[in-house]
Amino acid sequence: MALFRMLFLCAVLVLLTSKEGMSYEEPENDEGVACTGQYAESFCLNGGTCRYIQSIGEYYCICNGDYTGHRCEKKQV
């Protein structure tokens, strides 16, 4: 019984300390979560929308209109 109790407590600790066990303002989906602070204001160019993918720790942009690129820096022709 003591072994079971110890294993249960270890499992709870893993869940509480993992990223998946943490709560965020917005649930992550395929497009990540909205950027905050300086990234929200200046990471994307040409009116793009900044997103953050928590699982890989990367920022990217959803571009508007005729722009492409990681930060919406390229105009399509």
UniProtKB/Swiss-Prot annotation:
Q: Does Secreted appear among the keywords?
A: yes
- InterPro entries referenced in this protein's UniProt entry, alphabetically: EGF-like_dom
What Gene Ontology terms describe where this protein resides (cellular component)? extracellular region; nematocyst
SUPFAM superfamilies listed in its UniProt record: EGF/Laminin (SSF57196)
Positions of the propeptide removed during maturation: 24-29
Q: Which domain of life is it from?
A: Eukaryota
Q: Which cysteine-cysteine pairs are annotated as disulfide bonds in the entry? A: C35-C50, C44-C61, C63-C72
What the protein does comes down to: Has both toxic and EGF activity. Its EGF activity consists of rounding cells (morphological change) and inducing tyrosine phosphorylation of the EGFR in A431 cells, but with a lower potency that human EGF.
Protein name (record)? U-actitoxin-Avd12a
Species of the source: Anemonia viridis (Snakelocks anemone)
